[in-house]
Regions:
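RNase H-like (RuvC/DEDD) metal-dependent nuclease/polynucleotide-processing core
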Residues: 2-248
Length: 248
């Protein structure tokens, strides 16, 4: 076990949203310990008793002030890396103002009013608004160093030697490939977590994605994570000062 000041003797966490809350994976490199659980909301996610040094969240954190076709620069860069068909898993985020909407019609109106070329919203994106709003209320520029936006398919891209996983995560073959990649990268107990938590409402895909997010959180803590846009380019910020970036 590492000493108290050992950089490996801390927890990091990854989280993936599902209908009833969040599935959270915590990992401690010093002991190789991994924990997995579900929590109800953002307050619980961001006040975990393990006090993780970094939390990688598969959810948009830096929403743009004006929505654009194709989303933010980081969304477009992520799709370019992943190619077709994995790039379709990166969706365009709503404008910040659309997070205040209570109905789909209002969200559409607010999103389209955010900029000259602003598109409407998909129903899938609208259903994410409660989680996006809760994150937006918590994350400040200062807190963004701890709470980071990640994308599981980008994590698997990095694990897979900078190559997208060919198989869909919704197939048995795709799940097998992703489980094998995670096992190679320190998450040998993944199958136990899937068996314990996946119950129909929470799917095996969600548990696998949360492990991928945790892997990127570990890389962030170690200083080895990469990002979209590339680190050679300065990440743009929105009006609230949040960086619009996706880590892997």
């Amino acid at each position: 076990m590492g000493s108290p000041d050992d950089s490996t003797d801390v927890w990091v966490a990854g989280a993936d949203g599902f209908r009833d809350g969040w599935v959270v994976v915590l990992h401690r490199s010093a002991t190789g310990t991994t924990r997995c659980r579900t929590v109800d909301g953002v307050d619980a996610l961001l006040s975990l008793p393990e006090s993780p040094a970094v939390i990688g969240i598969d959810m948009i954190i830096g929403c743009p002030d004006a929505a654009e076709p194709g989303g933010r620069a980081c969304d477009r860069a992520a799709r370019q890396l992943l190619g077709h068909p994995r790039g379709t898993s990166v969706f365009s985020p709503p404008a910040y103002d659309a997070l205040q909407a209570d109905t789909y019609a209002e969200a559409q109106r607010r999103n389209r009013a955010s900029g000259p070329d602003a598109p409407g919203l998909t129903k899938q994106t609208f259903h994410l608004i409660p989680k996006l709003r809760a994150l937006a209320e918590y994350v400040t520029p200062e807190r963004q160093d701890r709470v980071r936006e990640v994308h599981p398919e980008l994590s698997f891209y990095a694990m897979n030697g900078d190559a997208p996983v060919a198989e869909s995560k919704h197939t048995d073959a795709g799940r097998a490939v992703r489980r094998a990649l995670l096992a190679e990268h320190g998450f040998a107990d993944l199958d136990e977590a899937v068996s314990a938590l996946a119950d129909g409402v929470l799917g095996a895909d969600d548990v696998i994605d949360a492990h991928a997010a945790c892997w990127t959180a570990r890389r962030l803590h170690e200083g080895t994570a990469e990002r979209c846009p590339p680190r050679s380019d300065e990440a743009p910020t929105n009006a609230r000062g949040l960086r619009m970036e996706i880590l892997r």
